[in-house]
């Protein structure tokens, strides 16, 4: 067993597929399959459950992934300590909700490029619950999500405060008028969206459970439907003021308990040996993403 074997193992765990892992690691599938088989023989345990569609980690596989991540981080740390160069380099996978990605993603890429030019920053957007799960399972090094965070395996840093507003077509003069609509229509993201959950809970507090939902997969789509008069939604105030302030839509303030959102940066407590993650945390915990 060597570090390359562990890297191939981690790639299969990340992609859930031997072919995709081989492509990502610039090798052939037969090599990946052989290396995984050797690891399973060496540890005397099955590391993956193989199905027709994908492969999933077994309990033993999850344990090995935990240790392989630590080993990889320690090797990178040793290179910095022993090598001639103190430049931090490597890949860092960071996740965002779509709205945070739109607002803060470009700035983060710029800051990292200036401060740590050899760090390959791989950004992805997903729903809050998926981001948490991906960090827990080492598919992401860190993620920006709306608080709160309760998992004991995760550490978090408060990054910024946001405010949610109700976004409606121009014709409405108040939220009361909106709620009086006989066929209320909400424009929302998929299940698992933090803003959708806030909207649904807000409607419940107003005894509204019978309403139509139109699911969109982009901020632009949500705004387009609102502008067309089809329905309303909840979105961060900064998204509207930054990108959509000239659109034919209207925003209304919400009560503090509904509108207040704290964005935090989450990462695994046992992943802090990663030099790239340490650099990322130190940079953005001080900047607070202003």
Q: Where are the regions a protein language model picked out?
A:
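Short helix-boundary/capping micro-motifs
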Residues: 10-28
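A short LG(V/I)-centered, amphipathic sequence patch enriched
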Residues: 40-57
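Alpha-helical linker/hinge and terminal dimerization helices associated
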Residues: 42-43, 64-86
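Central regulatory/effector-binding core of bacterial HTH transcription factors
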Residues: 89-152
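A late-sequence structural motif
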Residues: 104, 252-290
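Beta-alpha-beta core module
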Residues: 151-158, 162, 224-269
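Flexible hinge/capping segments at coil-to-helix
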Residues: 153-191, 197
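Secondary-structure junction motif
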Residues: 185-206, 273-277, 281
